[in-house]
Structures are given as structure tokens and as C-alpha cells.
A protein has these predicted regions:
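Histidine-dependent nucleotide/RNA phosphoesterase domain, centered on the 2H-phosphoesterase fold
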Residues: 1-190
Length: 190
């Protein structure tokens, strides 16, 4: 099964993020008509902490056992604000809303999760963890890469704050209509 660990959004933040996405989509369509992106449906918005990929049933059981105990990280307030794109240079491939105040809590939770997952042979990606909310995957940035980056930088994208008190292990089921996410297990923060 395809698994990842992430943070579920509360409804006010999810609603605010959907509003930001609609605003950005309209502004990008007007400024860059050849820009093509697949916007993430609001119901599937989450903050990915760790993508595990395909995991067989046996290792998945071990994974859930390893995630049974709370992470030794206190619950924290997380603010989502500001927009950007990955990669930071070159044509954008992923559009995101960033983590503002409280981002250090996400980084601390990621570090504790990394220590726990290392016992099962999982290693973090080579690049540093950068907490963010993916809002779109770019199919074709078109010819207006500079305009896209300017629009993203100018978007105020204030989505509010939420309390992060747990991480969630999700199962991702892919279909022609996109991915469906099923929460399997919640890992509380201590």
C-alpha cells in the first residue's frame, strides 16, 4: 500500500487555503494563459511530513507499531501564509503555501519521526525538510515563469493558525480521478 505521514488541516485553515487557491488560479490564468496546473482539491489538502511510498502489509504493521507511542514533541500552533514554488530556481513544478510561525514545531516533529523511522530502515530525503502545503502540481509553466513567480510572491495567502497535536499515517489510493487519502493511524504529540 502507498503510505505517507502528514498533518490534517482544520476546517478554517482548509477553507482559507481554498480561497487562496481560487485567487491564485484566476490571477495565473489571466497573466499566463499557457500555464497548466493540477490544483489539489480542498478536501485532500494536508501537509506532508514524510512520504513512505509503497509499503507491503508486513512492514506496514511494523510501521504502525513503531508509531504507536506519542512523539516527544509538544503540540504547537502553526500558521500557514505566503506562497512560493519548488524548485526555487527554474520552472516551477509545485506551488505551495508556506509554514510561518510554528514551522520549527514541524521541523522538530520531523526530526523525532526521522529517529523513529530510522529503526525501520527509512532515511529522510537528501534535501532539508521544508514544511509547506502543496496546492498545485504544475504540468506546464508556459512561457511566463517570471510572471508566475511574481504573482506567487505578491499573494498575501494568510490562511490562519491551527493547533498541531498529532501526525497522521495516511494510505493513498491512486485512481484516474486523483488520489484518495484514508487516515490509518494518528500519532499524538506529547
Amino acid at each position: 500500500m502507498r503510505l505517507f505521514i502528514g498533518v490534517e488541516l482544520d476546517e478554517p485553515v482548509r477553507t482559507a487555503a481554498a480561497t487562496v487557491m481560487r485567487s491564485l488560479a484566476a490571477r495565473l490564468d489571466a497573466a499566463a494563459p499557457d500555464f497548466q496546473a493540477r490544483w489539489i482539491p480542498a478536501a485532500r489538502l494536508h501537509i506532508t511530513v514524510w512520504f513512505l511510498g509503497e509499503v507491503a502489509d508486513g512492514p506496514a504493521s511494523l510501521l504502525m507499531e513503531q508509531l504507536r507511542a506519542p512523539l516527544p514533541v509538544p503540540a504547537f500552533e502553526l500558521e500557514l501564509r505566503g506562497c512560493g514554488a519548488f524548485p526555487r530556481g527554474g520552472p516551477p513544478r509545485v506551488l505551495w503555501i508556506g509554514a510561518g510561525a510554528g514551522a520549527e514545531g514541524m521541523t522538530e516533529a520531523f526530526g523525532e519521526l526521522a529517529r523513529r523511522l530510522a529503526t525501520l530502515g527509512y532515511a529522510p530525503e537528501a534535501r532539508p525538510y521544508s514544511p509547506h502545503l502543496t496546492i498545485a502540481r504544475v504540468k506546464d509553466p508556459g512561457r511566463a515563469v517570471r510572471a508566475i513567480r511574481q504573482i506567487l510572491a505578491a499573494e498575501p495567502a494568510t490562511c490562519g493558525r491551527m493547533t498541531v497535536s498529532a501526525l497522521t499515517l495516511f494510505r493513498s489510493r491512486l485512481s484516474p480521478h486523483g488520489a484518495a487519502y484514508e487516515p490509518l493511524h494518528r500519532v499524538p504529540l506529547a
